[in-house]
């Protein structure tokens, strides 16, 4: 009976590990080196503005938290 409980616990832990990924972990190598990079807006010649990264809300919040901690 105890062996069955241990086995079930190990299976649940393995499934949870696959389901819950760390959002701050680097991208998986198979996605390429730009997988985690922010998308760039195109060059706007009329305003003479270079390409700027576009961050999603989670990335902006992370940057705010990091700036607050510094």
Curated annotation (Swiss-Prot):
**Swiss-Prot/TrEMBL keywords:** Signal
Where would one find the signal peptide in this protein?
1-16
Matching entries from InterPro entries are given as: DUF5437
What name appears for this protein in its UniProt entry? Answer: Uncharacterized 7.6 kDa protein
């Amino acid at each position: 009976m105890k062996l069955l409980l241990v086995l079930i616990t190990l299976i649940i832990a393995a499934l949870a590990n696959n389901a819950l990924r760390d959002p701050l972990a680097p991208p998986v190598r198979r996605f390429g080196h730009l997988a985690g990079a922010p998308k760039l807006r195109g060059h706007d010649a009329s305003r003479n503005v270079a390409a700027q990264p576009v961050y999603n809300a989670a990335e902006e919040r992370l940057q705010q938290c990091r700036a607050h901690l510094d």
